[in-house]
């Protein structure tokens, strides 16, 4: 099979990359009614599978889970989760033939096997759903022409999808219809009903394309969301210890620092995050971020280029075929780093201390978010999509590091994200070492002293921060999320 994106001509590629429309709330006036009375069968009962299913059932839909025979016979975790939550569970052969909508929520690397197994069992005119378009776009999976193919992609981990729904809210969501598979013209109605059933319409829905979702999702997770946090954690920890900081304190400053500073990012964008600093520290963080952007721009561009061309996907799929040799090696090496093995600090670090002593970390966040956003937009991805795949998801990933360091982040994210994270961080760490060697006192681990600042310089820096395109689109999109739960700041 050929990479679907690479079979398109340039005009088609640009059209699909640039497909992005913020949908009005009135477009979801019918809620999930289009799927009411129809049978929805979910394949896979991981975090997205279970939590989307719970939301959809609570929205009045008929939900069941199709699992492999061995998973049922051996009562594996997927079977236990589905049955303990009161869902009907059966084999593919028992449930798929009656399904009006089959939702494939298995890991990316299983998609081809799953889809090739369920396709022959699906009835004529049924629909197939995804929450990530990798199988369609990068693998180039061919789906029967009578089958409608749709996507509903919540921009949060599965647990967050459920928690926000229980609060009567939801999480921002991308929806799409595969243009090669919409024989009855009902794909958008199915996708809208599915999104409404998960609660996504309450937080904002973007009508996108499979191509735009995949290319932007891969870019975000490889660079700012995971790769930058991993590279930054390793570099900052080593720098602190090298300068005599207690390893336990250094570890805590970094582990919980990302979460604390990105909570400000979530509530008020880069502007609020930078406003948490004193004026001298803000000027220094801005200067550091500009240096970082200049150094890292070629690396961000390379990742985007490799994602657009399919080079990244072909390399990762080759590793799948080689039993994940590279992935597992990188995972093991990460687990042995000094940051991951450092002792725990029993003392308390105050919230403002994370900002005052983490000027470099704030600069890394600013540089990474802006670079990821700019690189995506330069490649034809619309600003709203680029925002969700860079700034919006960052606090959620930072929260995983706060739980159990990089180990937890790499466990929670997909194998696809983890593989891309290692590619980026293994290139970024040596790239930034000369920069790290030139840091000044107060950049990391010590507060920058209060002092006089030049009013004109401060005015210009504030204007530069607030006028960046990601701040403009972010302000608009956050307006739809005013009811979002505040991620608890770790202490």
From Swiss-Prot:
Residues 15-208 form the KARI N-terminal Rossmann domain. Its EC number is 1.1.1.86. Pathway: Amino-acid biosynthesis; L-isoleucine biosynthesis; L-isoleucine from 2-oxobutanoate: step 2/4; Amino-acid biosynthesis; L-valine biosynthesis; L-valine from pyruvate: step 2/4. The gene is ilvC. Its cofactor is Mg(2+). GO terms for cellular component: cytosol. Belongs to the ketol-acid reductoisomerase family. Involved in the biosynthesis of branched-chain amino acids (BCAA). Catalyzes an alkyl-migration followed by a ketol-acid reduction of (S)-2-acetolactate (S2AL) to yield (R)-2,3-dihydroxy-isovalerate. In the isomerase reaction, S2AL is rearranged via a Mg-dependent methyl migration to produce 3-hydroxy-3-methyl-2-ketobutyrate (HMKB). In the reductase reaction, this 2-ketoacid undergoes a metal-dependent reduction by NADPH to yield (R)-2,3-dihydroxy-isovalerate. InterPro entries: 6-PGluconate_DH-like_C_sf (IPR008927), 6PGD_dom2 (IPR013328), KARI (IPR013023), KARI_C (IPR000506), KARI_N (IPR013116), NAD(P)-bd_dom_sf (IPR036291). Substrate binds at residue 414. GO terms for biological process: isoleucine biosynthetic process; L-valine biosynthetic process. Keywords: Amino-acid biosynthesis, Branched-chain amino acid biosynthesis, Magnesium, Metal-binding, NADP, Oxidoreductase, Repeat. One of its GO terms (molecular function) is magnesium ion binding. The active site is at residue 132. Pfam families: KARI_C (PF01450), KARI_N (PF07991). Mg(2+) 2 binds at residues 217, 389, 393. It is an enzyme of class 1 (oxidoreductase). Mg(2+) 1 binds at residues 217, 221. This is Ketol-acid reductoisomerase (NADP(+)). NADP(+) binds at residues 45-48, 68, 76, 78, 108-110, 158. It catalyses: (2R)-2,3-dihydroxy-3-methylbutanoate + NADP(+) = (2S)-2-acetolactate + NADPH + H(+); (2R,3R)-2,3-dihydroxy-3-methylpentanoate + NADP(+) = (S)-2-ethyl-2-hydroxy-3-oxobutanoate + NADPH + H(+). Binds 2 magnesium ions per subunit. It comes from the Bacteria. Residues 209-344, 345-484 form the KARI C-terminal knotted domain.
């Amino acid at each position: 099979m050929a990479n679907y994106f690479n079979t398109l001509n340039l005009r088609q590629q640009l059209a699909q990359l640039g497909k992005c429309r913020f949908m009005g709330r009135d477009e979801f006036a019918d809620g999930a009614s289009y799927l009411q009375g129809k049978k929805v069968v979910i394949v896979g009962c991981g975090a997205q599978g279970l939590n989307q299913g719970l939301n959809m059932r609570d929205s009045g839909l008929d939900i069941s889970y199709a699992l492999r025979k061995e998973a049922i016979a051996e009562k594996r975790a997927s079977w236990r989760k589905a049955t303990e939550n009161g869902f009907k569970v059966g084999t593919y052969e028992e449930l798929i033939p009656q399904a009006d909508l089959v939702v494939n929520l298995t890991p990316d690397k299983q998609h081809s096997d799953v889809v090739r197994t369920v396709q022959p069992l699906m009835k004529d005119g049924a629909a197939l759903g995804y929450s990530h378009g990798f199988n369609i776009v990068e693998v180039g999976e061919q789906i029967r022409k009578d089958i409608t193919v749709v996507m509903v992609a919540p921009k949060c981990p599965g647990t967050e999808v459920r928690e926000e729904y229980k609060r009567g809210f939801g999480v921002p969501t991308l929806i799409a219809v595969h243009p090669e598979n919409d024989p009855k013209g009902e794909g958008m109605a199915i996708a809208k009903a599915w999104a409404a059933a998960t609660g996504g319409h309450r937080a904002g829905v973007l009508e996108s394309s499979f191509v735009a979702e995949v290319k932007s999702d891969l870019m975000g997770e490889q660079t700012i969301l995971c790769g930058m946090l991993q590279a930054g954690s390793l570099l900052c920890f080593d720098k602190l210890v090298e300068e005599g900081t207690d390893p336990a304190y250094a570890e805590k400053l970094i582990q919980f620092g990302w979460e604390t500073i990105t909570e400000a990012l979530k509530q008020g964008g880069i502007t609020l995050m930078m406003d948490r600093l004193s004026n001298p520290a803000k000027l220094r963080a801005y200067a550091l971020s500009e240096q970082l952007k200049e150094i890292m721009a070629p690396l961000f561009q390379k990742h985007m280029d490799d994602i657009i061309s399919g080079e990244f996907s072909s390399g990762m799929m080759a590793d799948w075929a080689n039993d994940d040799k590279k992935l597992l090696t990188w995972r093991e090496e990460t687990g042995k780093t000094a940051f991951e093995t450092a002792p725990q600090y029993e003392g308390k670090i105050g919230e403002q201390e994370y900002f005052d002593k983490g000027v470099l970390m704030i600069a890394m966040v600013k540089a990474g978010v802006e670079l990821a956003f700019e690189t995506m937009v330069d490649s034809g991805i619309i600003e709203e999509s680029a925002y969700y795949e860079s700034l919006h998801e960052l606090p959620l990933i930072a929260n995983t590091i706060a739980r159990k360091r990089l180990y937890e982040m790499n466990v929670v994210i997909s194998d696809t994200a983890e593989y891309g994270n290692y590619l980026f961080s293994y290139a970024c760490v040596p790239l930034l070492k000369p920069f790290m060697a030139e840091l000044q006192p107060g950049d990391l681990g010590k507060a920058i002293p209060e002092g006089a600042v030049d009013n004109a310089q401060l005015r210009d820096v504030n204007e530069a921060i607030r006028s960046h395109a990601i701040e403009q689109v972010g302000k608009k999109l956050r307006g739809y999320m005013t009811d979002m739960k505040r991620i608890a700041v770790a202490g």
